[in-house]
Regions:
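Bilobed "Venus flytrap"/periplasmic-binding protein-like clamshell domains
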Residues: 2-27, 31-32, 90-156
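Alpha-to-beta junction loops
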Residues: 31, 49-58, 111-113, 155-164
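Residues that line or immediately flank small-molecule/substrate-binding pockets and catalytic motifs
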Residues: 60, 144, 166
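Pocket-flanking alpha-helical
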Residues: 21-22, 34-75, 149-153, 169-170
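Soluble extramembrane regions of membrane proteins in the secretory/endomembrane system
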Residues: 84, 165-169
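A structural signal for short loop-to-beta-strand junctions that line the ligand-binding cleft
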Residues: 74-87, 92
Length: 170
């Protein structure tokens, strides 16, 4: 069995992994594939390094950090994996309600926001953007939610915004 680390079911990695494994199952009879829901990029790199999965999707910036032991992976380099392909470009977006009054990242000060699932590429990108905007954790109330949870809480007005790093077509 080949275990494929995707991400949460609400993002693009999970459906991509399912489509990929369906195609591979048709092409390579006798190989069993299992898509694993994970927190995302950083988690997949850790799971690959720990031999819990054999294949995983990760953002290029986090692959670089893991390889060199910096940023999210400052505690040490990760090894035991290699890049196979570049899938598609991704962009980090900030999602808000139309009536929120939030027009730029600077408007997030004092707001409750989801920075993505813990160990996800979205979390890393959100923290980078907040840092550049001069918004440390003391100035925003952050929650670690996957996309589905964040969208639900945004609709219920329990959070003010959420970060989403996903394929450009999202």
């Amino acid at each position: 069995t080949i275990r494929f680390g995707a991400a949460g079911v609400g993002g693009m990695y999970y459906p991509f992994a399912n489509a990929y494994t369906e195609l591979m199952s048709e092409e390579e009879k006798g190989i069993n594939w299992k898509v694993k829901s994970t927190a995302g990029s950083a988690a997949n790199l850790r799971l690959l390094s720990d031999n819990y999965i054999e294949l995983g999707i990760a953002q290029a910036d986090l692959i670089d950090e893991a390889y060199y032991g910096k940023g999210t992976f400052h505690s040490g380099k990760y090894s035991g994996y290699k890049a196979v392909a570049s899938l598609y470009p991704e962009a980090c977006q900030i999602v808000v309600r139309k009536d929120s009054g939030i027009d730029s990242p600077d408007d997030l000060e004092g707001k409750t926001i989801s920075i993505g699932a813990e160990e996800s590429g979205t979390e890393r990108n959100a923290r980078q953007i907040l840092e550049v905007c001069g918004l440390p954790d003391a100035l925003v109330d952050t929650e670690n939610l996957d996309y589905t949870q964040a969208a639900d809480k945004l609709e219920e007005k329990k959070i003010d915004a959420f970060f989403c790093t996903a394929g450009v077509s999202t």
